[in-house]
């Protein structure tokens, strides 16, 4: 059962078997059928006109999303906060890296990048569907994290404190800064 992308509902799956590249495409289609998701078969020409990619692999899904906020989640455990990340591929990479370390919650704080961007989804290699991810402004995020007694750990290479000296408790938020500007002042001021 998927948890991620907040509250996402799969509605339709569009397929073009002429474009399939993997061996598990029919298994995936069967899983959608079991969940009573509508399967729409398309010609190669029509599929290519709908796809975001230059060389699509024959499967395209349509989602209806619901905007969620930090209050919509029962936060516990480590949280990755992506502060003003600009490039969708970088956000997707952070998602899959966070999952490798068992993070279940990711906040895109003051997000420049749309968390539903196809490049975010693709570069997360599917892990976006196994996490809670949402966008929120930094001030609200700091406020909620403090109310929940979270340690705020800024990954700042110019910090006087070393990450090596930190002994995490159960609830901590790891802050990763933007590609160009690093960590915002609000996160530096509120770091543990």
What would you call each of these model-derived segments?
Residues 1-9:
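Single conserved hydrophobic/aromatic residue that forms the stacking wall/gate
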Residues 4, 35, 124, 129, ...:
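Short, structured coil segments at secondary-structure junctions
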Residues 12-16, 40, 71-159:
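RNA substrate-binding interface of SAM-dependent RNA methyltransferases
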Residues 15-23:
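Structural motif
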Residues 23-35, 187:
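Short, aromatic/basic amphipathic alpha-helical patches
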Residues 32, 36-59:
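Glycine/small-residue-rich loop that forms an oxyanion/phosphate-binding "nest" at active or ligand-binding sites
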Residues 54, 59-75:
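Acidic/glycine-rich phosphate/pyrophosphate-binding loops and surrounding catalytic core
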Residues 154-192:
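Active-site/ligand-binding-proximal alpha/beta "capping" segment
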């Amino acid at each position: 059962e998927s948890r991620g992308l907040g509250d996402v509902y799969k509605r339709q799956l569009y397929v073009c078997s002429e474009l399939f590249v993997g061996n598990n495409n029919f298994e995936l289609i069967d899983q959608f059928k079991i969940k009573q998701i509508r399967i729409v078969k398309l010609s190669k020409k029509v599929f290519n006109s709908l796809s975001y990619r230059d060389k699509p692999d024959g499967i395209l899904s349509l989602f209806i999303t619901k905007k969620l906020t930090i209050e919509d989640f029962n936060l516990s455990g480590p949280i990755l906060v992506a502060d003003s990340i600009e490039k969708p591929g970088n956000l997707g990479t952070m998602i899959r890296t966070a999952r490798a370390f068992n993070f279940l919650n990711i906040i895109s704080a003051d997000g420049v990048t749309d968390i539903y961007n196809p490049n975010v989804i693709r570069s997360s290699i599917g892990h976006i569907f196994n996490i809670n991810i949402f966008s929120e402004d930094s001030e609200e995020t700091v406020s909620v994290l403090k109310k929940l007694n979270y340690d705020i750990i800024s990954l700042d290479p110019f910090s006087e404190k070393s990450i090596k000296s930190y002994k995490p408790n159960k609830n901590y938020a790891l802050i990763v800064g933007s590609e160009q500007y690093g960590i915002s002042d609000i996160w530096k001021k509120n770091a543990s």
